[in-house]
Amino acid sequence: LAPLILLGLERLVKEGRCGLYCVALAISIYTNYYISIMVCIFVVLYFVVLLITEKRSFRIVGNFVLYSILAGGMASVLLVPEVCAILQTNFGDPDFPTQLKSYFSVLDELARHCMCVTTERGLEHWPNLYCGVAVFLLLPVYALNQAIPMKKRFANLALAGFMLLSFSTNVLD
């Protein structure tokens, strides 16, 4: 559902149409609330990128907040009991890290994109990344593509860099 959510978000920002975004996000939250937490975090980050690159009025921020809350409200029949149940467990009181700590180096993280890397099943915080080496070969092509506006290239590459950084630091994890 993530591609539909992002398509809906782009329609919301560019055309003011909210239906696909709201319904797809609600279905995502309802069907798998745990992964939807990550999807919602990415949606907020991508929304910021769209605000930077699309030259829209900040009135769209109100629509984004409204339809995001509406999507969460549509899934609240599942969310409210789940939140109550989680608050009764040890996960209800998370300890937020007080010091910045890196789990592994950037080169080690980038090596996870190569073939024949074992799947991480432990608690060593290694991300399972499977996009392949082609992404790194095509990254300079994207960065140097003059057909894409510089602001859009910079914002998208900054988002990708932030996501890679978030895999390896405890505060962003």
Stretch-by-stretch model annotation:
Residues Y21-C22, I35-L50, E82, A134-L137:
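Transmembrane-embedded, aromatic-rich helix segments that form part
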Residues A2-L4, L20-S28, A134-V141:
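Hydrophobic, membrane-inserted alpha-helices
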Residues I60-L144, M150, F162-D173:
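Periplasmic/ER-lumenal interhelical loops and adjacent helix-loop junctions
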Residues I5-L20, T53:
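Membrane-interface transmembrane helices that cradle and orient dolichyl/undecaprenyl
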